[in-house]
Amino acid sequence: MKKAILSVSNKTGIVEFAKALTQLNYELYSTGGTKRILDEANVPVRSVSDLTHFPEIMDGRVKTLHPAVHGGILADRNKPQHLNELSEQHIDLIDMVVVNLYPFQQTVANPDVTMDEAIENIDIGGPTMLRAAAKNYKHVTTIVHPADYQEVLTRLRNDSLDESYRQSLMIKVFEHTAEYDEAIVRFFKGDKETLRYGENPQQSAYFVRTSNAKHTIAGAKQLHGKQLSYNNIKDADATLALVKKFDTPAAVAVKHMNPCGVGIGDTLEQAFHHAYEADSQSIFGGIVALNRAVTPELAEQLHSIFLEVIIAPKFTDEALNILKQKKNVRLLEIDMTIDSNEEEFVSVSGGYLVQDKDNYVVPKEEMKVVTEVAPTDEQWEAMLLGWKVVPSVKSNAIILSNNKQTVGIGAGQMNRVGAAKIALERAIEINDHVALVSDGFFPMGDTVELAAQHGIKAIIQPGGSIKDQDSIDMANKHGIAMVVTGTRHFKH
């Protein structure tokens, strides 16, 4: 029977993953809080102490730092000497290590964090196990991101968990531990950047970098322009998160943390034209992110508009020369890699909230058409584009989109019909190919009725209201195609 060690700080999906491993004939070992959760879920799991024959000591500071653990992980199974030594010491082979680390970055992001709290959240045993397993990737599977659980299970079931895939997991581990160590260094060096002021001039502010990863705002390479302001940093982060959702050439414009225009196209120039056309007024003074290299042709378009920040994975030399003619525009070069394990946190009085980022995308095949009329292909494309955008809009949020751009956005309203009114009134076009997208369900049929009055013929929304049928009946009355996704996307 194969053996796996599970010791995770981020408990997302761990119970389901552990259950699946037991069904695949893995014997599970765990520590502390992870073991408690698995015990409560009735998942067969043993304590790591059963491997080490040594108890956890010093409030859990020492639990996996033991030859019985690391010998089982590091043994080269192609070397008889290693296997003989394991046998002599009664050490079992470990086939899988599933570990993510104490939340150091989240802990030190709290401005009131104490030195003792920071120190207690420096993980020692976790990185040691991860690095040992990653070093021995030819024989051991190591998982640091919950997002990889499903792929690992699929490969275990179809016998395709090969060395090449284990090597890809190994790379993720060393990237993760490098970022983790860098965050520790930055914190204790006091690596913070004083900003001119905060959200408003009367507020002082500084920027603490807990990572220097190239796919983050903190790790961005600034090629030109003034120091980023507090508001620039927040808006740039929101813009970057949204543009990363698109595989096709895409452009995103953001003002005050809300997208004002999103466009896609066969080329980046087309995508930006669509984003600009979506709201040519609000883009003034905004942040623009692009997911392809900026060419001279696109740079000319960008140069003609007042923008605070332009983000892209690359700028050609000629494009830079054009854009640098404006001395104040900030140009940021950022890797467009998506970090599937990102978390976000918000400070509140006396503490802070931590949650996974809302990156889940419902597959089209899991969405349900609930009306008598089904969407056309073009309406489906419009819905799916809008559904990528709506999680980035403050709730209550209503988006109107076609298959190439947003055409109207109603953000941050206290009631849904109010958000719909704004989106419909500001729409640059409404026709049979435009879809209305809602981040939450309709509590009654009034939003659908309003959409019908403006000529909307396709709606996508989460569903889940006790009065869903009222909205469905209203859609049927007006010949509107409605799709429900089963997943909402509130943003506060």
Swiss-Prot record:
GO terms for molecular function: IMP cyclohydrolase activity; phosphoribosylaminoimidazolecarboxamide formyltransferase activity. GO terms for biological process: 'de novo' IMP biosynthetic process. It comes from the Bacteria. Its EC number is 2.1.2.3, 3.5.4.10. SMART domains: AICARFT_IMPCHas (SM00798), MGS (SM00851). SUPFAM superfamilies: Cytidine deaminase-like (SSF53927), Methylglyoxal synthase-like (SSF52335). Residues 1-144 form the MGS-like domain. The keyword Heme does not apply. It catalyses: (6R)-10-formyltetrahydrofolate + 5-amino-1-(5-phospho-beta-D-ribosyl)imidazole-4-carboxamide = 5-formamido-1-(5-phospho-D-ribosyl)imidazole-4-carboxamide + (6S)-5,6,7,8-tetrahydrofolate; IMP + H2O = 5-formamido-1-(5-phospho-D-ribosyl)imidazole-4-carboxamide. The keyword Hydrolase applies. Keywords: Hydrolase, Multifunctional enzyme, Purine biosynthesis, Transferase. Pathway: Purine metabolism; IMP biosynthesis via de novo pathway; 5-formamido-1-(5-phospho-D-ribosyl)imidazole-4-carboxamide from 5-amino-1-(5-phospho-D-ribosyl)imidazole-4-carboxamide (10-formyl THF route): step 1/1; Purine metabolism; IMP biosynthesis via de novo pathway; IMP from 5-formamido-1-(5-phospho-D-ribosyl)imidazole-4-carboxamide: step 1/1. Transmembrane segments: none annotated. CDD domains: IMPCH. The IMP cyclohydrolase activity resides in the N-terminal region. PANTHER family: BIFUNCTIONAL PURINE BIOSYNTHESIS PROTEIN ATIC, BIFUNCTIONAL PURINE BIOSYNTHESIS PROTEIN PURH. This is Bifunctional purine biosynthesis protein PurH. It comes from Staphylococcus aureus (strain MRSA252).
